[in-house]
Amino acid sequence: MTNYREIAWQGLWKNNPGLVQLLGLCPLLAVTATLTNALGLGVATMLVLIGSNILVSLVRDYVPKEIRIPVFVMIIAALVTAVQLLINAYAYGLYLSLGIFLPLIVTNCIIIGRAEAFASRNNAFSAAFDGLMMGLGFTLVLAVLGATREILGQGTLFDGADQLLGPWAKALTIQVWQVDTPFLLAMLPPGAFIVMGLLIALKNVIDKKLKERQPEAAVQPSVTRARITKVS
């Protein structure tokens, strides 16, 4: 029986694709200059993850083992193309901001990794849930990284939200503080490396604290059985 709680725990925290597996670092570090871009890429990746996991799970019994990887890549490429066309049609500004990193979702190791490790071995519903949790975990890391860099770099939050949600979302932009000159280190990839390292360190500290709080298993004393033989 599938343990959905364990799948959620693995995707969101224990085996988070961004903080633990360190997959998808290229777009993660390059696109997360703002929260809007981070959410856009995260949602696109999550949609592809869910769709690819479902399709791989459905065709797993019909694809020969020898050619499964090329077939999985073709499925992922088709889904990425569909998502790319949707973003191009309904969020053109975001499409321009994400640039080459949108089609490069095809090569993201998170997606092919989950297709091979989980979707090809489980039913469609479990595979879809795994894709949702892994995608959500990746999106959360992108969002935290993007929000931190945007606040430090230009003193705003949700800048350009209208590119993702439409003209009404301009009201969501928050001016955290007034910045005369942007903090370039936070806006450029070196700053992303630093913030990402701090997030990984924070997760390791939290994991260590949680492990220390767990009660140690009581040591059961060994019992030696005495054999009694009847003496006549």
UniProtKB/Swiss-Prot annotation:
GO biological process, one term: electron transport chain
Top-rank EC class of the record's enzyme: translocase
Membrane-topology annotation of the record: Multi-pass membrane protein
Principal localisation: membrane
Keyword terms of this UniProt record: Cell inner membrane, Cell membrane, Electron transport, Membrane, Translocase, Transmembrane, Transmembrane helix, Transport
Places the protein is found: Cell inner membrane
GO CC annotation terms, alphabetical: plasma membrane
Highest taxon of source: Bacteria
Subunit structure: The complex is composed of six subunits: RnfA, RnfB, RnfC, RnfD, RnfE and RnfG.
Biological role: Part of a membrane-bound complex that couples electron transfer with translocation of ions across the membrane.
Family of the protein in this entry: Belongs to the NqrDE/RnfAE family.
UniProt protein name: Ion-translocating oxidoreductase complex subunit E
Organism: Shewanella sp. (strain MR-4)
